[in-house]
Amino acid sequence: MTAKDVKFGNDARVKMLAGVNVLADAVKVTLGPKGRNVILDKAFGAPTITKDGVSVAREIELEDKFENMGAQMVKEVASKANDAAGDGTTTATVLAQAIVSEGLKAVAAGMNPMDLKRGIDKAVNAVVEELKILSKPCETSKEIEQVGTISANADETVGKLIAQAMEKVGKEGVITVEDGSGLSDELDVVEGMQFDRGYLSPYFINKPEAATVELDNPFILLVDKKISNIRELLPVLEGVAKAGKPLLIIAEDVEGEALATLVVNTMRGIVKVAAVKAPGFGDRRKAMLQDIAILTAGTVISEEIGMELEKATLEDLGQAKRVVINKDNTTIIDGIGDEAQIKGRVAQIRQQIEEATSDYDKEKLQERVAKLAGGVAVIKVGAATEVEMKEKKDRVDDALHATRAAVEEGIVAGGGVALIRAATKVATTLKGDNEDQDVGIKLALRAMEAPLRQIVTNAGEEASVVASAVKNGEGNFGYNAGTEQYGDMIAMGILDPTKVTRSALQFAASIAGLMVTTECMVADLPKEEKADLTGGMGGMGGMGGMM
């Protein structure tokens, strides 16, 4: 076992704070409408330019082991905020830095770290409740556009694209972000259902340039079992060949002789077929097959209800206008299913969402609603260079997550104003159980000014003056760093999703609280390089003459 280096008390905390500051200072330059870029070196290819807090945080690794521990803890704050809300990573980092630095000062002044942490937790819980009261629902297309614009660093085109996409596919529809081919951004809306299963054999591909299978007006056979015997499929294949239409088979699996025969028939042009695995597993697969059946007016061939594949007829097959399959996804466009039945199915799944207990189940059910009720929107990001495209794609991704969060939990005034309003309200009523807890409450509430101060600093203004003016205001009154004007933040379209602000605060306080209560740090001692034993033998070369 390697020897350890152990630091205690103030020595440990000073090192930890140094690491926190290096990471947070690198991340916080990106905050706000006038935030700057950070360039990240890559082992291969061109450097990446980004304004995304979590992307910067992930790149930072410090040489000093103790400083690195502090940096990694704050990196965790950014990652957690990103996982929970998909945005707010820079805000979370700024909050964590503010709470840690204020907290460590209090510890150095002799306060009890555990009581400080309890005070911080009380303040954060009270502010989160206050944020919920301040929150208002985000419903109109204009509000969605404003949230997207703010999250994409004041890029209005991104906000507009996301608002259009949500309008087309509904708030629960599937929206993806891809690389575009031109200079401008584009929005493609795919009406239909997409699931994450690709073709079972590359020999089905009929569009080699795009490596996809495209079937026009196909029949769709839905089977809830593995197909390995071609004899079971023959009646359906003959019927489809007579009708002169292509066929898509969605089954638990197609293997062996059955798959080989389908491939041979396709290559010879006898019948145009493609096969994919059914999405999901177990009961979820059965439910998703039923969704596809309703969407395409087909029937799931299942032995559980006494149906056999050999006896299936063309009446049992679903139909759609078009099917596109690549190696990862299958998209069914314009199924001929009855509108009323589709709506009934959606209502049924929504009921299951209400009753679901686990978050995972809810998420999967939500996906099914999206696939049935909405469609698939693809935002294609255009840029002049690959470096610019990566940077822009990051911002569009952030904006997309932010708008989803806004639709989910509502919006509050942006620019750090909501935190200040909530903190001011809480400061008048919240009391701790002892003096040290009161100090914890005060320092946490003071730290909540940090995002506004940083936005103002990045805009080149005096943070204290602006923070004081905003604190003296009421309601949504705040400072628009983009135009350098004071006013009603919501009227100016500067909105933050409540979920993003809440998550940033909770994760920052959680990890900052742990760091404030740290008393000892342990790291491996650096290994000393052993001296090269051959180093002093250089003079031996002349011994050849002694023989």
UniProtKB/Swiss-Prot annotation:
Q: Which PROSITE patterns match?
A: CHAPERONINS_CPN60
Coiled-coil annotation reads none
Record-linked Gene3D superfamilies: GroEL, GroEL-like equatorial domain, TCP-1-like chaperonin intermediate domain
Identify the main location.
cytoplasm
GO BP term, pick one: protein refolding
Which Gene Ontology terms cover its molecular function?
ATP binding; ATP-dependent protein folding chaperone; isomerase activity; unfolded protein binding
Q: Name one Pfam family in it.
A: Cpn60_TCP1
Q: Does the keyword ATP-binding apply?
A: yes
E.C. no: 5.6.1.7
- Which enzyme class, named as a word? isomerase
Gene Ontology cellular-component terms listed: cytoplasm
Could you give the subunit structure recorded for this chain?
A: Forms a cylinder of 14 subunits composed of two heptameric rings stacked back-to-back. Interacts with the co-chaperonin GroES.
What does the UniProt record say this protein does?
Together with its co-chaperonin GroES, plays an essential role in assisting protein folding. The GroEL-GroES system forms a nano-cage that allows encapsulation of the non-native substrate proteins and provides a physical environment optimized to promote and accelerate protein folding.
Q: What is this protein called?
A: Chaperonin GroEL
Q: Which organism is it from?
A: Histophilus somni (strain 2336) (Haemophilus somnus)
Task: Tell me the lineage of the source organism.
Answer: Bacteria, Pseudomonadati, Pseudomonadota, Gammaproteobacteria, Pasteurellales
The gene that this protein is the product of is groEL
